[in-house]
Amino acid sequence: MTAKRPLALLILDGWGYREDQESNAIFHANTPVLDNLKANYPNGLISGSGHDVGLPDGQMGNSEVGHINLGSGRIVYQELTRISKAIEDGEFDDNPALCKAVDAAIAANGAVHIMGLLSPGGVHSHEEHIEAMIRMAAKRGATKVYLHAFLDGRDTPPRSAKGSLAHFTELFASLNAGRIASIVGRYFAMDRDNRWDRVVQAYDLITQGKGKHSATNAVDALEAAYARDENDEFVAPTAIVDANGDSVSLNDNDALIFMNFRADRARQISRSFTDPAFAGFERAVTPKTHFVMLTEYAGDIQGDIAFPSEDLVNTLGEVLQNSGKTQLRISETEKYAHVTFFFNGGKEQPFDGEDRILINSPKVATYDLQPEMSSTELTDKLVEAIESAKYDVIICNYPNGDMVGHTGNFDAAVKACEAVDTCIGRVVDALAKVGGECLITADHGNAEQMRDPSTGQAHTAHTSELVPFIYVGRDASIAEGGRLSDIAPTMLNLMGQDIPAEMTGRVLITIKE
């Protein structure tokens, strides 16, 4: 076997660039490796938000969107944009999957249950979509419409759900067609790391109306949670009961519509509702519902899909496969789906010649408790892969900046950035020994802003800041005005490979002769 000189793409998740030093964990971190690379190698800033990644103008980027754009080499119009457009055009009200579920529930005298992240965050869901769904169900004649609200506080300020809950309480009153049935923090309902002890609590809340707490209206329930010192993300499962103290349960022939459009945090709880062989926890009840997912969460999840994904051909992974190249995808649990499923344009199956390495993220309640996460183990495996000379291309994601950034803990975020910097030093050294090269970038910002200047609260959400782009390799210049979709064609060009017509991104690096 000929020894390969790998081209590595290192994605520093949640690592944006911000001039302002206030609450900027990346600026305050001691990062000698990255400082040295920026001083001595071609680098610039590229865009990972808004129209540049297929999101509405001004919308912050996120990991799913970022990796789809990175891997596909074109601007991919995201589900948020597609679904909002369908609502504007009136097509949403005629969506076959949604109409079928609502009509079936009405015909069986059942209820329409709508669940999802009630948030204007636009990362996993958008509350405007949830409102459109409630209005559509009522318009079709449903009188028992129940909202199971997952609360955010991660892609939004930590205590910001009150306005949304008040608005939806008023919406139901005006439609006279149901009510908010439960509230629960996303920590429970949207886990993606097999922490079934959390998910079962959300499942029991939705299926049986059993929560740790109860209240007669959602805003009171939220105020009680705040009094218990629970921010939105961590609100304990709370049933909203009627005047008789009765909660809402999920029954056979009801419709269950999941309004999250992003797959990774929707999969686990979806499987608990739909998989006959589900083994994550003991289910007290298993109602047979008309289940609809807003987008396809995974090929093996049973249910109708309101907005099937658009097929992306000739992504970077596919082009490498067709050229007979070998590739490695590697990350921790938290971002493994991003360097595989999302980077491959929503395809689960690995391409020929594509290996995958999953490093378990630490089992801690929140990552500020272990800001280095599993970066050392990840880097051990990555360096080993580089030294093996088996791979033409390596795609690696370091989750720390994002996952610790989401906690709002500034000191922990600084430590997270420092841990990643140390790891990058090891990777760059390993690449140098085998004649490899690397590109360093990020999918979106986060850790560069840890406090919200307007509210004074911790800033736990992503940002719309530009992200770094560094080329560690030959003498070269970098074009300005780049975006994430330019990375894949740039990589192919560095490898001397043809760029397919579907990749509309630009080549950002010009090698100096």
Curated annotation (Swiss-Prot):
Biological process, per Gene Ontology: glucose catabolic process; glycolytic process
Oligomer status and interactors: Monomer.
Function text: Catalyzes the interconversion of 2-phosphoglycerate and 3-phosphoglycerate.
Annotated residues for binding of Mn(2+) 1: 402, 406, 462
Keywords: Glycolysis, Isomerase, Manganese, Metal-binding
Family classification: Belongs to the BPG-independent phosphoglycerate mutase family.
Cofactor list: Mn(2+)
UniProt: substrate binding residues: 124, 154-155, 186, 192, 262-265, 335
Species per Swiss-Prot/TrEMBL record: Shewanella amazonensis (strain ATCC BAA-1098 / SB2B)
Gene Ontology MF annotations: manganese ion binding; phosphoglycerate mutase activity
Active site: 63
List of residues binding Mn(2+) 2: 13, 63, 443-444
Class of this enzyme: isomerase
Pathway linked to the protein: Carbohydrate degradation; glycolysis; pyruvate from D-glyceraldehyde 3-phosphate: step 3/5
PANTHER family: 2,3-BISPHOSPHOGLYCERATE-INDEPENDENT PHOSPHOGLYCERATE MUTASE
Presence of the UniProt keyword Acetylation in the record: no
UniProt GO cellular component terms: cytosol
Protein name in UniProt: 2,3-bisphosphoglycerate-independent phosphoglycerate mutase
